[in-house]
Regions:
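Mg2+/Mn2+-dependent nuclease catalytic core
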Residues: 64-93
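Charged phosphate-binding loop/patch that engages nucleotide di/tri-phosphates or the phosphate backbone
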Residues: 142-177
Length: 177
C-alpha cells in the first residue's frame, strides 16, 4: 500500500465512533497515473466526508516526505495554457462549501519529514496559491494557519486525534469563527 493510501487508512481508523465517515472513491484515472482522457471518470471534491452532529466536514488528505508540499501535489498539474492547476476547482468547490452553515472544508497535510499533521482551511490553501510567490506550502506556514492534528505512532500504523480536531472545529463553529 502506498504512503498516501496508508495515511488515508490510518486517518479513517482514527474516526471517533460517534462520527460518520465516508471515503469518496477515486476515479479510474487516478489508478492509471492521472490519465485525463478516460471517459466517465469521477472527479470528487475531496477524499472524505465526516459528519458528527451538528457539523459536516470535507477533508482532502495529502502526505509528503519533505517539509514542504508542492502546490502541484495539492492542486494537480499546472496547465500553462489555461494558467491554472488541473484540480484547482476541487479546492474552490471546497471553499464554496464552507459558505454554508455547519460545514467545514480542510486540506489535511501529513508532513512525514517532521512527523506533524495539520488541517488547513481550504480557503487559506486557496489564498496561499494566489497570494504567495512560493510553489510549495512549508509545514511552518501550515502550523501558523492550520490546526495541528496530534498523532500517535503504533507499531506500524498511526492514530490521529480526529476527535480533538472535530471538537475544535465544532467549538469554532459555536463561536462563529
Amino acid at each position: 500500500m502506498n504512503t498516501g493510501k496508508q495515511f488515508e487508512a490510518d486517518f479513517k481508523a482514527s474516526i471517533p465512533s460517534d462520527a460518520w465517515c465516508y471515503r469518496l472513491k477515486d476515479s479510474a484515472a487516478t489508478y492509471y497515473g492521472g490519465n485525463e482522457s478516460l471517459s466517465f471518470s469521477i472527479d470528487n471534491i475531496c477524499d472524505f466526508l465526516v459528519y458528527r452532529y451538528p457539523m459536516n466536514h470535507l477533508f482532502e488528505l495529502k502526505t509528503i516526505e519533505t517539509p514542504s508540499i508542492p502546490l502541484e501535489k495539492v492542486f494537480g498539474k499546472y496547465d500553462k495554457a489555461k494558467c491554472k492547476y488541473r484540480k484547482e476547482k476541487h479546492i474552490t468547490d471546497m471553499v464554496d462549501a464552507m459558505g454554508y452553515g455547519g460545514q467545514t472544508a480542510h486540506v489535511i497535510v501529513n508532513y512525514r519529514a517532521v512527523n506533524r499533521t495539520f488541517a488547513i482551511p481550504a480557503s487559506k490553501v486557496l489564498a496561499f496559491r494566489y497570494n504567495e510567490s512560493r510553489k510549495s506550502i512549508p509545514w511552518q506556514w501550515a502550523e501558523q494557519e492550520g490546526i495541528e492534528v496530534k498523532a500517535k505512532r503504533l507499531r506500524v500504523h498511526w492514530r490521529y486525534d480526529v476527535d480533538g480536531l472535530l471538537k475544535r472545529l465544532e467549538k469554532e463553529n459555536d463561536n462563529g469563527m
